[in-house]
From Swiss-Prot:
Residues 725-1790 form a coiled coil. Residues 465-487 are annotated as: Charged (hyper-hydrophilic). Residues 1-724 are annotated as: Globular head. Residues 991-1790 are annotated as: Dispensable for the protein function. This is Intracellular protein transport protein USO1. The lineage of its organism: Eukaryota, Fungi, Dikarya, Ascomycota, Saccharomycotina. Residues 452-484, 1185-1221, 1326-1351, 1485-1547, 1645-1667, 1722-1742, 1762-1790 are annotated as: Disordered. It is found in: Cytoplasm, Cytoskeleton; Cytoplasmic vesicle membrane; Endoplasmic reticulum membrane; Golgi apparatus membrane. One of its GO terms (cellular component) is endoplasmic reticulum membrane. It comes from Saccharomyces cerevisiae (strain ATCC 204508 / S288c). Keywords: Coiled coil, Cytoplasm, Cytoplasmic vesicle, Cytoskeleton, Endoplasmic reticulum, Golgi apparatus, Membrane, Phosphoprotein, Protein transport, Repeat, Transport. Homodimer. Dimerizes by parallel association of the tails, resulting in an elongated structure with two globular head domains side by side, and a long rod-like tail structure.
Length: 1790
């Protein structure tokens, strides 16, 4: 039976997870094709719903079967279809393969959509499709197999393979393309698919070719050579041309992809006869054969066709002109222009047509000429399409004028792209054609001047139309009424828009934008002829001579129009004016002069830039930029000179504000939102008004981005320096050419020098051989040389004596300088003592004035203070005795004081560093305080919430107990009255307890702050008491002091006048140092006080932190105090920021002044030498006067010491009396108010003292001016020294430059260090703040947890109480209905209050979140600041490296110059030596001649041989003379060359060189005379030859020869004498030269030393000035802070006193009320006890008493909680509680 049932049962249904693997297994492993095919079809069925599992387990089997069964068409079709489904299915639940017909925008090519179109619309590829693509492209065999499937005739297989390859190209384009290219026949077969008869295959092949060709130049070339253009144009014709569907667009876009970025394909396209086809295609909408109706697809088709045209003429290629000519010859340009100016063309097509025409015309003169000949019918492009078709007669107008008209007046949002295209076409028409630009501007100027002429004539003049007479006649015929109206409406002039005022410009603001854009195009600086075009526009004038108006130039009129349009409704109008002016003025000096000629415009622009309006940010920034550019390119000769203009701007604007405005323009204005892409202007965004967001021209954007650094740093340039224009690329090329020429010349010179060097070496070898011969003759000259040495030794001794005398003089000078310095230091010390004495006199005078005023007030209160005066008179005696004792102690204290002053001066520097560290700690503590205050606010808010909740619950309990008692007392009238009183008492108790707790908290906080102020108050009260006690003393001593002060005052005034007269004549170079040291000693005490205050503050903050962690009460108490401190700290921070900014400005001004002074120093250095003598005489006189002043100062010091002793004695007596009078302070509190008034008078005196300090600062400035004057004189004297030492001026200048660069390096390094320190401090502060935040967050979280636990406890208690109250309600329901109603109403009110409190809690939580967000913002801003400072550090480091490179270059230049000078000197010395050697050789030759003549006398028979020897020697001498002459000539040439180099390097050596040259010329003359004499000797040699011939004939001629020899001897002797004289002269010249060189070296050394000293002194002075400026600023800031703190302390004391009085009054009143209420309670309780005894209804009373006991227990709990919280409960209340408990016990017993 079981077997039968198993057979009968149905088989189990197999799941999908089981079937798919089985199918995959069948596909891979089954042997029969039919089984594999059926398995593939099964997978195909599952592929739509179970895509993931099919891909995971069936992709490899499918691909393997495809390779195996590629011959079976059915299986191939099934496999390809399944893979396509898996590709296209998509990730989501929707099947994209089936719902695609409704989604796609094109017709469906077969069963499945094209994957490329899906990718374009979906724009995402899922992971599974990538998996399939990787599997297909893993080996190239699969791609090759798919290409082979195209040869199969089956439609479905071919279509599915194309779609599969599209899918692979969509997912993995690079791999698929490389696999296709690897097969040689793949592209040809792909292109052959275009000829397929099936349209789906053709369309999908077009899409596949688009993907394969895109961005692949190799494939582009392969496709282009497959005759693809003819095939595509034939497909376009079959589809109907531009009227066709998406297939036409696909064909055109495929052509576009083939031609893109491929010039060879472009030339092939143009040369293979495709232009007529393209022209025919484009002319279809214009043809009159058929009416052309437009739709979206046709617009897309024509735009892609126009894109093909513009691709062939891309700008920048070498083939563009050729292509432009081809397009012009094939009439494509005319077709495109007809499209652009055809009235039926849609608005989306017209701008594209205009842009393509611009590309065809750009930079082609032939095309531009042909373009200018075209006339076009006018119509308005902003009107609808069919409105102008039937609108009357047609008026022909030149193309240029209609383009200008459309650009300016086609005012519609929809035609903005046509306006842009018109401007582009105009620019292309004028591009690289200067003649057209010039003629156009001249005609525009004529039209502007002749504005009364007809517009039609203007149009003809502008465009230059070349129409025949017939056409003009036809135009005249068409003119009529309509023609006149038309001419009046037509406008095409740029100057009218630019220079005429238009009230309706707000309606068409882009009219001005486009005009300025075209003028900027004309004014491009890269343009060669831009200057001439600028001149033409600059000379255009406006204004009528008839109306007596001055004609204004173009820039002046534009600037006036700018001032009128600054507040225009549309912001584009002033922006276009401002950008145009900035572009014009930049680099144009003439234009800046025209702009600066009208000062009223500049003033109005400056006033506008400082109007307080937030909306005009871009305009204000552009106005400041215009002013800065005008300054950058102004000059001394401009109508508003450069220096005056600089001062005028910086007074109101300032450098920092200017730079910040330009940064703001770049980051926070409309400029920051500009899209840098040039084509973005064609499709701009729209603003709120509907206009496009286009504000700036591309030319202005380019200029600003390229020259932002120069524009930003315009005001930082020196006004005394003339501006430099921008260096063009052409000038750089010229310099490079010159550099190459010079390099070639240098190489040629090097070759020449090498050749000359070789020649000279050969000559040197010959000369060395001769030198050996001449060494023997040198011994003869030693005798003469010894005599010269003796003379030289005598001269050396004389030189030594002179040098010794010079050294003595220099030593004397040094001694005098040291004495002068010592005298000056003494003078300064005396001056400082005088200033101190003057200050002490002033303080005494002020003290007298205050004493007199106090005396008057004291005399008024004598009647009241009579009794006190008797006691004070007794105390006066004790005070006088103490005064005597204190005078003795005073002398000791003076000695100790002098020692302390020395030690204090040493400690000042250390304390300054400590102050800096304390300031840094203070800043950190401020940050901590701010964070703590925020957290305290948060915690206090939570505390208030919790306490309010507790109070509300307490009030509920109290009210409910009152209700229960009122219900019990309703039974009896007596109990009702008593319980009403008890309610009032309990309410007052609760309120009083709450108020007491609040007041106690306030009192605690006040007491803590009072303790902080008691120290300061005690010091003030001590001073007040001292003043009180000194009044009586001073009244007695007043007359004596007045008499003494009058006499001393007269003496002091006389002495001061004498000292001032003497000090004015003396040098006051270092007065500032002494004065500032005295000021530092004065401020030392103030700084110590500040340190103490800061330490106290630090201790207070630490105590507050500890108390905040211990208990939450103290947080609330200190909250208000911390808020006040926070406000004060914020004020201090703002004040410090303002002071820092002012100090920075002062530093910049001081640096400028210092630079000016350094420039003036050079002028005054020449006068120092003359005035040094005068000063030396005056110093001797001043020394005598100083001795007298020293004696007088000593006497003054003694008097001051006596006065100080008296003051100290008075102070000590007052302190002793203060200890005695502490008991009388309470009685004298009334007099404190009067003394406060006196304090106010003292404050006024302090202000007067501050004014006196300011007057002293003025005096210090005057003394600084005198110092500067004398420094200038010193600089003049140094100039005189330099005048004698100008021989090495260039070397010194280079040294100065290097030193300047080093100084700048040092300054930059110091700035870097400061910034690094700031960054480190910021980082440290940030770390500290973060650690504190984390710590406070932890504490706050813990406190929150505690508070939440308390809340939960309270909630539980409230629930328990509510349950108890509900029980009581049930009991009370038996009572009256009125009581229940009241009870319910009160409960509702309480619930409303709870809701209100919850809302307040939510608001506070939001505030806490806001504070957290602000903290995060602050941290982010700190991070940004750190990043900015790090970037600035990097830039500074780069600048430092550049400066170091400059220094190394300058050092190398200096070394090269020194080497050149040394080489020149050595060459001169060598030349002189060679000349001397040649002369010595001549002398030796003459001596040989003498010896030979003597031998001839002895041996007449050997005369022939001797004559031969003489001839040989003469010839050798002649050759030697010739060589010497040549060497001398070469030396002369070298000397001239060396002269030129020396003149360039050292100009002042010319005089010495001229002397040397004159001497050399004399020596040359002597040499020439010697030559002439030698020639005579040569002639005598010829006579000797005649004698030889006649010797055999006659002996008489021998005698004649002997006589002639004697004559020669005499001549030779004369020559020898002359040679000796010349040698002596040469030696003397050499000695003089050596002396001069030694003198030069000494002068150079002295110059270097003086320069080093001057530089050191200047650096020291600068450092001292900077130190004193910093110290002065710090002291001023500290004085201001102390004054503010003093005022705050006074105000706080008054406020505290008021608060204390109010608190005392309230506490007293409350205590009185509590006592009254306690008494009433006692009475009521006594009455209650009596009533309870007398009451009969014992049962009800027992119930009520039980309720009362419960309530009393709850009250006891709440009191215990109040005690835990710190609220004190009076003893009376506790007694009442005990009494109540006793009464309750008695009641229970009863």
């Amino acid at each position: 039976m079981d077997i039968i049932q198993g057979l009968i049962q149905q088989p189990k249904i197999q799941s999908v997870d089981e079937t798919i693997p089985t199918l995959c297994d069948r596909v891979e492993n089954s042997t029969l094709i039919s089984d594999r095919r059926s398995a593939v079809l099964g997978l195909k069925a599952f592929s739509r719903q179970y895509r993931e599992s099919v891909i995971a387990s069936g992709l490899k089997p499918l691909l393997n079967t495809l390779k195996r069964d590629y011959m079976d068409e059915d299986s191939v079709k099934a496999i390809l279809e399944t893979i396509l489904i898996l590709f296209i299915r998509g990730d989501g639940h929707d099947d994209l393969t089936r719902g695609w017909i409704s989604q796609q925008s094109r017709l469906q090519n077969g069963k499945y959509p094209s994957p490329l179109v899906m990718k374009q619309e979906k724009e995402q590829v899922d992971q599974f499709s990538l998996w399939i693509a990787d599997a297909l492209t893993q080996s190239e065999d699969l791609i090759h197999l798919l290409v082979e499937f195209w040869e199969i005739d089956n439609f479905h297989i071919r279509l599915y393979t194309i779609q599969l390859l599209e899918a692979v190209m969509a997912t993995r384009p690079l791999k698929a393309r490389s696999a296709l290219i690897s097969l040689p026949t793949s592209i040809s077969t792909m292109v052959s698919l275009l000829d397929d008869m099936h349209e789906p295959i053709r369309d999908e092949a077009i899409l596949l070719l688009m993907a394969v060709v895109n961005d692949s130049p190799h494939v582009q070339k392969l496709v282009a050579f497959e005759n693809i253009f003819e095939r595509l144009f034939s497909i376009i014709e079959e589809e109907g041309g531009l009227r066709g569907s998406l297939v036409v667009n696909d064909c055109l876009s495929l052509i576009n992809n083939i031609l893109k970025y491929n010039t060879s394909n472009q030339t092939l396209f143009l040369e293979t006869g495709n232009l007529p086809k393209l022209a025919h295609l484009l002319s279809e909408p214009i043809s009159q054969d058929e009416v052309f109706f437009w739709n979206d697809q046709r617009i897309v088709n024509i735009n892609t066709a126009l894109d093909i045209v513009s691709l062939t003429v891309e700008p920048g290629n070498t083939v563009t002109t050729k292509h432009q000519n081809a397009l012009l010859d094939s009439s494509v340009l005319m077709v495109v222009l007809r499209l652009a100016f055809f009235h039926n063309i849609p608005k989306k097509v017209r701008p594209v047509a205009l842009l393509t025409a611009a590309n065809m015309v750009r930079s082609n003169e032939h095309a531009q000429l042909e373009f200018s000949k075209i006339d076009v019918p006018y119509f308005d492009p902003s009107l609808p399409v069919n409105s102008t078709a039937n609108g009357g007669p047609i008026k022909l107008i030149p193309v240029v004028s209609i383009l200008i008209n459309w650009m300016l007046y086609a005012n519609s949002v929809h035609t903005f792209d046509t306006r842009v295209a018109c401007s582009r076409l105009l620019k292309a028409y004028f591009m690289d054609n200067f003649d057209l630009q010039r003629d156009f501007l001249l005609k525009q100027v004529q039209l502007c001047n002749n504005s009364t002429n007809n517009v039609g004539d203007n149009a003809k003049e502008n465009g230059g139309s070349n129409k025949s007479d017939k056409e003009s006649d036809s135009d005249k015929d068409t003119d009529g009424k309509d023609g006149t109206e038309y001419e009046g409406s037509f406008k095409a002039n740029l100057f009218e828009v630019l220079l005429n005022y238009d009230a309706e410009l707000n309606l068409n603001p882009f009219k001005l934008f486009f005009t300025t854009d075209i003028f900027m195009f004309f004014f491009q600086q890269d343009h060669k002829y831009s200057e001439e075009l600028r001149e033409i526009t600059r000379n255009v004038t406006t204004g009528n001579d008839l109306e007596d108006e001055e004609p204004l130039k173009a820039i002046q009129t534009i600037s006036e129009l700018l001032t009128t349009s600054l507040t225009a409704a549309d912001i584009r109008i002033p922006i276009s004016y401002l950008t145009f002016l900035i572009y014009w003025l930049f680099g144009d000096f003439k234009a800046t002069n025209d702009f600066l000629s009208d000062k009223s415009v500049i003033k109005s622009l400056l006033s506008f830039s400082y109007q307080i309006q937030d909306e005009d940010v871009t305009i204000k920034c552009l106005v400041t930029m215009l002013l800065g550019v005008a300054y950058e390119f102004s000059s001394k000769e401009s109508p508003f000179p450069r220096k005056e203009y600089f001062e005028f701007i910086t007074k109101t604007l300032g450098k920092d504000n200017y730079a910040s405005r330009i940064k703001q323009f770049k980051k926070d204005s409309y400029f920051s939102k500009v899209d840098m892409n040039e084509d973005s202007i064609l499709t701009p965004e729209l603003d709120e008004t509907g206009l496009p967001k286009v504000y700036f021209s591309t030319y202005f954007i380019q200029l600003f981005n390229e020259n932002i650094y120069r524009i930003r740093t315009a005001l930082s340039h020196d006004p005394d320096e003339e501006p430099i224009n921008k260096i063009s690329f052409e000038e750089v090329e010229k310099l490079q050419r010159q550099c190459t020429k010079l390099k070639g010349e240098i190489t040629s010179l090097q070759t020449e020098t090498e050749s000359t060097h070789e020649n000279l070496t050969e000559k040197l070898i010959a000369l060395t051989n001769e030198h050996k011969e001449l060494d023997e003759k040198y011994q003869i000259l030693n005798s003469s040389h010894s005599s010269l040495k003796e003379n030289f030794s005598i001269l050396e001794t004389e030189l030594k004596n002179v040098r010794d005398s010079l050294d003595e003089m220099t030593q004397l000078r040094d001694v005098l300088e040291t004495k002068d310095k010592e005298n000056q230091t003494a003078l300064l010390e005396y001056k400082s003592t005088i200033h101190k004495q003057e200050d002490s006199i002033k303080t005494l005078e002020k003290g007298l004035e205050t004493i007199l005023s106090q005396k008057k007030k004291a005399e008024d209160g004598i009647n009241k203070m009579g009794k006190d005066l008797f006691a004070l008179s007794r105390e006066m005696q004790a005070v006088e005795e103490n005064c005597k004792n204190l005078q003795k102690e005073k002398d000791k204290s003076n000695v100790n004081h002098q020692k302390e002053t020395k030690s204090l001066k040493e400690d000042i520097a250390a304390k300054i560093t400590e102050i800096k560290a304390i300031n840094e700690n203070l800043e950190e503590m401020k940050i901590q305080c701010n964070n703590l205050s925020k957290e305290k606010e948060h915690i206090s808010k939570e505390l208030v919430e919790y306490k309010s909740r507790f109070q509300s619950h307490d009030n509920l309990v109290a009210k409910l107990t009152e209700k229960l008692k009122s219900l019990a007392n309703n039974y009896k009238d007596m109990q009702a009255e008593n319980e009403s009183l008890i309610k009032a008492v309990e309410e007052s108790k609760n309120e009083s307890s709450i108020q007491l707790s609040n007041l106690q908290n306030k009192i605690d906080s006040m007491s803590q702050e009072k303790e902080n102020f008691q120290i300061e108050r005690g010091s003030i009260e001590k001073n007040i008491e001292q003043l009180k006690k000194t009044i009586s003393d001073l009244e007695q001593t007043k007359e004596e002091i007045i008499s003494k002060s009058d006499s001393s005052k007269d003496e002091y005034e006389s002495q001061i006048s004498l000292l001032k007269e003497k000090l004015e004549t003396a040098t006051t170079a270092n007065d500032e140092n002494v004065n500032k040291i005295s000021e530092l000693t004065k401020t030392r005490e103030e700084l110590e006080a500040e340190l103490a205050a800061y330490k106290n503050l630090k201790n207070e903050l630490e105590t507050k932190l500890e108390t905040s962690e211990k208990a939450l009460k103290e947080v609330k108490e200190n909250e208000e105090h911390l808020k006040e401190e926070k406000i004060q700290l914020e004020k201090e921070a703002t004040e410090t920021k303002q002071q820092l900014n002012s100090l920075r400005a002062n530093l910049e001004s001081l640096e400028k002044e210092h630079e000016d002074l350094a420039a003036q120093l050079k002028k005054y250095e020449e006068q120092i030498a003359n005035k040094e003598r005068q000063y030396n005489e005056e110093i001797s006189q001043l020394n005598d006067e100083i001795t007298s002043t020293q004696q007088e100062n000593e006497s003054i010091k003694k008097k001051n010491d006596e006065l100080e002793g008296e003051v100290k004695a008075m102070k000590s007596t007052s302190e002793e009396q203060s200890n005695l009078k502490k008991s009388e302070i309470d009685a004298l509190n009334l007099q404190i108010k009067e003394l406060k008034k006196k304090n106010e008078t003292n404050e006024a005196s302090l202000l007067e003292s501050i004014k006196s300090v300011e007057s002293e600062t003025v005096k210090i400035k005057e003394l600084q001016d005198e110092c500067n004057f004398k420094e200038k004189e010193v600089s003049e004297l140094e100039d005189k020294l330099k005048a004698s030492e100008d021989k090495n001026s260039k070397y010194l200048e280079l040294q100065k430059e290097s030193e300047k660069i080093k100084e700048e390096l040092d300054a930059k390094t110091t700035e870097l260090k400061i910034q690094l320190e700031k960054i480190t401090n910021l980082s440290k502060a940030k770390e500290k703040s973060e650690s504190e935040l984390s710590r406070l967050k932890k504490t706050s979280s813990e406190e929150r947890k505690n508070a939440e636990e308390q809340l939960e406890k309270l909630k539980n208690e409230i629930q328990i109480k509510n349950q108890a109250f509900e029980k009581e309600r049930k009991l009370l329901n038996e009572g009256s209905s009125t009581i229940t109603q009241e009870y319910s109403e009160k409960i509702n009110t309480l619930e409303d209050e709870l809701i209100r409190l919850q809302n307040e809690n939510e608001l506070k939580a939001k505030e806490i979140d806001n504070t957290r967000s602000e903290l995060e913002k602050v941290s982010l801003s700190n991070d940004e600041l750190l990043e900015e400072k790090q970037n600035t550090i990097k830039s500074l480091q780069d600048e430092i490296l550049s400066y170091k490179d400059k220094i190394t270059r300058n050092d190398e230049k200096l070394l090269s110059i020194e080497r050149d000078n040394k080489r020149d000197l050595e060459s001169l010395k060598e030349q002189l030596r060679a000349a001397q050697e040649s002369k010595a050789k001549v002398e030796e030759g003459l001596k040989k001649l003498e010896e030979e003549s003597s031998k001839e006398k002895a041996e007449l028979e050997k005369s022939k041989e001797m004559m031969k020897k003489l001839e040989s020697t003469i010839e050798s001498n002649e050759t030697e003379l010739k060589s010497s002459m040549e060497t001398i000539r070469k030396s002369d040439e070298k000397l001239e060359q060396s002269k030129k180099s020396a003149e360039e390097d050292i100009k002042n050596l010319q005089h010495e060189k001229s002397d040397l040259i004159s001497r050399i010329n004399e020596s040359e003359k002597d040499i020439e005379e010697l030559k002439s004499k030698l020639r005579i000797e040569a002639k005598s040699g010829s006579e000797l030859e005649t004698v030889k011939q006649e010797l055999n004939n006659a002996q008489e001629k021998i005698r004649i020869n002997a006589e002639e020899n004697t004559v020669l001897k005499s001549k030779l002797e004369d020559i020898e004498r002359e040679l000796k004289d010349k040698q002596a002269e040469i030696k003397s010249n050499q000695e003089e030269k050596e002396l001069l060189t030694s003198r030069l070296k000494e002068l150079e050394q002295e110059l270097d030393s003086t320069q080093q000293k001057a530089q050191k002194s200047e650096e020291e002075r600068r450092a001292e000035v900077r130190k004193f400026q910093v110290e002065k600023s710090q002291l001023d800031e500290k004085a201001m802070l102390l004054e503010t703190k003093y005022n705050d302390l006074v105000n706080k004391e008054q406020a505290w006193k008021r608060d204390e009085d109010t608190v005392k009054k309230t506490t007293d009143s409350q205590r009185q009320e509590i006592e009254k209420l306690a008494k009433e309670l006692d009475n009521l309780k006594a009455e209650n006890s009596k009533l309870k005894e007398a009451n009969e209804d014992r049962s009800e009373i027992d119930d009520l008493m039980l309720l009362v006991t419960d309530l009393d227990e709850k009250n006891a709990k709440y009191r215990s909680k109040l005690k835990d919280l710190g609220v004190e409960i009076s003893s009376d209340e506790e007694d009442d509680e005990e009494d109540d408990e006793e009464d309750e016990e008695e009641g229970q017993v009863a």
